[in-house]
């Protein structure tokens, strides 16, 4: 599933930063077991930065709307998703990566609904590179 970034310098820098995080996540997870989306390739097309990711079916918001809108999802599915999400969060913490935009839209599931992956690392950051602010946002 290709993703195209807008053609301007700020978007290119953001895309390159996201790619750096995706590569770091993949390098430390060669068996693809940590529930973070894997990027298969990156390329430029007509001055646009493009990324190709492993195929997933839909995001978690869509899956919950489709399969749990009236009564929720089964507790076993909640356990499975929670375990996989905590695995991803623990892995990102170990690599000192803060996702910074974790929401159902940025969590994807496969077509069997038994595998969950965190995606969209465009807002990710390293807490050591950030300034601490006394203000709440």
Question: Which residues are covered by each model-predicted region?
Answer:
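The N-lobe alphaC helix and its flanking beta3-alphaC-beta4 segment of protein kinase-like domains
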Residues: 6-30
